[in-house]
Amino acid sequence: SPDSRKVASCKIRPTEKRYVYYVESSPADQLQPKLHKQEYAKPGDELPFKVPCIYEVETGRAIIPSTELFNHQYHISRPSWDKDSRTLTFEYNERGHQNYRILEISAEDGTVRPIIEESSDKYVNYSRIYRHHLRDGKRIIWSSERDNWNHLYMYDRATGKPTHQITKGEWYVRDIIRIDEENEFIYFSANGVQTDEDPYHIRYYRIGFDGNGLTDLTPERGTHKAWFSRDMQYLVDV
């Protein structure tokens, strides 16, 4: 933890290894075929179970949370301490990929609560998840395909609810380039904003945290690849 008083770790319950087998029909070093096996978990197989835990450095006391909110896990990832050392956050991807949660563990008593929940009756595209905690500790920028397009939302951490949608429209946010917290701007790439050209052409944009002031930084027609200067005052576009 930032105050060096606690350590976060992960308790793992392993599972029996499962394999698939395949035949190499014409190996280079012999006439007979070879049988090979590869470790591979198939649909329905039990997966390793992970529990993020917190330990006090001085006393060795273990703070082990209830697993109720992350029981059916496909994967647990991105554990990170908050700067005040009071909580640990991590991402929970439910098996089946229809529920995705950002969970917070109290470093005092192990209480777990969701600060963001993403659900779909079809599929949560977890490969496109983006999360950024603002320095004020109160707001989180989050990406979601909940309206069938990938857009950015501002979340209130205390309530776990979105306060507003930052980007919106029938277009797709691709990558976040920079979060400028001082001036409250987001720099990002997107495709499909311009309805009169190829919807897969990528351009670069800037928008305010409040969702206002969308600015096209690469207005020329066509697809773009940009590199920004450190102060975000200049870009090289190819």
Give the residues covered by each predicted segment:
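Beta-strand C-termini and the immediately following turn/loop, strongest in propeller blades
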Residues: 8-14, 42-46, 80-83, 89-96, ...
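Long hydrophobic segments that form regular secondary structure
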Residues: 57, 61-94, 232
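Beta-propeller fold detector
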Residues: 63-66, 112-119, 163-168, 214-219
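Short glycine-/Asp-/Thr-/Trp-enriched loop segments that recur within the blades
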Residues: 70-76, 120-128, 169-176, 196, ...
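Residue-level recognition of a conserved intra-blade site in WD40 beta-propeller repeats
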Residues: 81-82, 133-134, 178-181, 228
